[in-house]
A protein has these predicted regions:
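Short cysteine-rich clusters marking metal-coordination/redox-active sites
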Residues: 3-6, 15-18
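Cys/His-rich microdomains that often coordinate metals
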Residues: 10-11, 22
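Active-site-facing substrate-recognition patch
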Residues: 16-83, 118-148, 186-193
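Short, well-ordered alpha-helices that flank and scaffold nucleotide-derived cofactor binding pockets
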Residues: 76, 105-109, 170, 174
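Short glycine-rich phosphate-binding loop at a beta-alpha junction
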Residues: 80-93, 152-153
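Substrate-recognition/cap helix-loop segment adjacent to the acidic, metal-dependent catalytic center
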Residues: 95-113
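Activation segment
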Residues: 160-161
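PRPP-dependent phosphoribosyltransferase catalytic core
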Residues: 166-193
Length: 193
């Protein structure tokens, strides 16, 4: 087997060196329109080769490994005083798995409960590599399939323009559901607060 990051021999998903490097993140925050805070673990350029595996079979293993190094650690120091639901954006299964559902699963604790297949995009348009104008004119058109009981944390893999997260927040707030913040693996823009 090989390390998914550096391709050196490794029995685990990441070799010892890469695992240490990926564990050494500093949680960043980016503020979107309307005040939505998006917390992220990595800069997009640092892990884009790993993120691009999300539509491949082996991406399943990479996303589990990344979630163990980031989202699972987040839940260890984030101790909410109340119950919270986690919603993964558009967690439909593409191929064999949903990469956003994998990330959401790793946030589960006594007080944090992921709920799956809750917020689904009616539009199947892919945003990867598209312009801001394209993204604004081709919305996700989310549909709320389940009503969460508690305030919500939104989960996605990447924040680029933030339009998907803002659209998700809008539909939830229209249904009187409080959105606390969003949590993503990577930030693809460097206008952080």
């Amino acid at each position: 087997m090989r390390c998914y990051n550096c391709y050196k021999f490794s029995l685990a998903s990441f070799c010892t060196h890469c695992k240490e490097e990926l564990q050494d993140y500093s949680l960043g925050v980016r503020k979107l329109e309307g005040g939505l805070k998006v917390y992220y673990f990595y800069h997009y350029d640092d892990i884009k080769h790993l993120l691009h595996t999300k539509h491949r079979f082996y991406g399943y293993f990479i996303f589990h490994a990344l979630a163990r190094l980031s989202f699972a650690k987040f839940r260890n120091f984030f101790n909410p005083p109340c119950f919270i639901n986690v919603i993964a954006l558009d967690d439909k299964t593409y191929g064999d798995y949903s990469h956003t559902a994998i990330l959401a699963k790793y946030l589960k604790t006594k007080f944090i409960k992921p709920i799956f297949y809750t917020l689904q995009a009616k539009s199947q348009v892919k945003y990867s590599g598209k312009s801001l104008h394209f993204r604004k004119t081709n919305k996700r058109s989310y549909e709320l399939k389940k009503i969460p009981k508690y305030p919500v944390i939104l989960v996605d893999d990447i924040v680029t323009t933030g339009l998907s997260l803002l659209e998700a927040k809008e539909i939830l707030e229209k249904n009187n559901i409080e959105v606390l913040f969003a949590l993503v693996l990577a930030n693809a823009k460097f206008d952080t607060i």
